[in-house]
Amino acid sequence: MLSRYIRLCGTASDAVKLETLSLGERYSMGCFSNKKRVVIIAGETSGDLHGAKLVKAMQKRNKGLFFCGIGGQALRETGVDILIDAREISVVGITEVFSKVPNILRSLRMVKKTFKTMRPDLLILIDFPDFNLHVAATAKKMGIPVLYYISPQIWAWRPGRVKKIEKLVDHMAVILPFEEDFYRKQKIPVTFVGHPLLENSLPTAQRIEDKWKDDVPAIGLLPGSRHGEIERHLPIMIDAARILLKRIQTIKFIISLSPDVEEKHVKEIVRKHKGEADFEIAAGNVRKVLEGSKVVMAASGTVTLESAISGTPMVIIYKVSPVSFRLGKAMIRVKNIGLVNLIAGKEIVPELIQEEASSTRIADTVFKMLSDPSGLKQLSLELLALRDKLGGPGASERVADIAFRMLEK
């Protein structure tokens, strides 16, 4: 952090003093008034990771940029000045949002104050639509250009939000192939940039082949990246694991721990529910879990797509509060909720949602998949084929192209 302030303001003695000052105070002192200023907002773990890749791509081309905004560990590590930690405002479900309302309102005020203080040259929004569209409205009033990277799933539910996007967003950078046509039909400027997950090192066909040679099956548990998701999903997954252990005594279990989740919290849930089963916890390394598992139990979200491009079969599960589920169900316009199935255009992996996501049902589904090795291997190949629909590597570079064009206007 100190070295970054030295780069911004020139001397070590100045930098030591500046670390104690607010963003507004530093701006008023001219620390980065000669730099292009970019505000980036990512309210979820996946957005934080993708945002960090974008920031790195932009920094590689131009060191004379100043970034600040809302995010998590990944964005912070790139040098983004984090005004608010994303965990303070991240939430899943409709009724679940009420507990975060004070934090959300405080964060909106902070963003508005930041806009007035330093007048950014560009606002980059990453998914997280209910919060980000409020921010976009403020930016629009102030004449700040808005780039929206990773579209809200308005093609799936609450399609009326497209009218807001049309009014508030200057350019959409979308990561799913069918989203480009959706926005073009609405005459909204859009570019399909491909999926940023393809920028990660991908397992080779040989590595996937080796996984099937292991006689001892390992099952991955991917309960989500938010506190509420883990509270709802992990106990059910652990109970399902205990049922599976009674049927397959040699089975192993690995829990994927998101970088933004405290390990002690997960360990406490495991302690309460594990019974005779043993669980390895893989902190911050979902790739290790995917590459080591023949099947994963995965909370619906980005990680299901990551499972697909690694060729790992999965059971998608999801639970929210009963009220959130009823309200959400009334607004959903698609048959499947899993990204894997949406991109495939059919259900290629099972989805167990709400009441269907019981420990018994999950265990039965996983056991059935493990009992058909040839079918499981064929499913792995189907999942790998989805890579071809995701645009190839280079998403961050393509979004950076758009960002720099907008900065130059």
Residue ranges of each PLM-predicted region?
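Nucleotide-activated sugar donor-binding and catalytic core shared by glycosyltransferases
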Residues: 2-9, 16-18, 22-409
